[in-house]
Amino acid sequence: MSNNILVITSNPEKDSMTDAVGAAFAAGAVERGASADVLDLYDEGFNPVYSAADRAHYLGHAPMPEDVVPIQRRLAQADVIALVFPIYWYTMPAMVKGLFDRVICRGFAYHPDGTPGALADRTVRVIMLTGGSRQW
């Protein structure tokens, strides 16, 4: 059994299906003896916008932007990472795209020389929620 589970959720609405599914995933992990941490990108105040600082880091001209480091630490501590989010207009929400662009990045998740990054050998589960009223 994996010991450390990180559940990442992204939905601006509290009491959403996203939050319920993320909480259920975390509760199931705890019932089986794991520890679970839920990271809600909205509650964290995560900024998904890829900036000049992110680009400078990617090019090797600047350090990792400080606001992404705490999230990277939580990711690095996890054995299993579960991403839980709704589908908007046939794709992931901007917050999740920003997570990939800004946090799951060069120098952390991978290295240009091919050496394993901090997320090597992690198990990832992606739970995408779809459905809605007929008007959508």
Give a label for each model feature.
Residues H111-W136:
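Short, glycine-/small-residue-rich phosphate/pyrophosphate-handling segment
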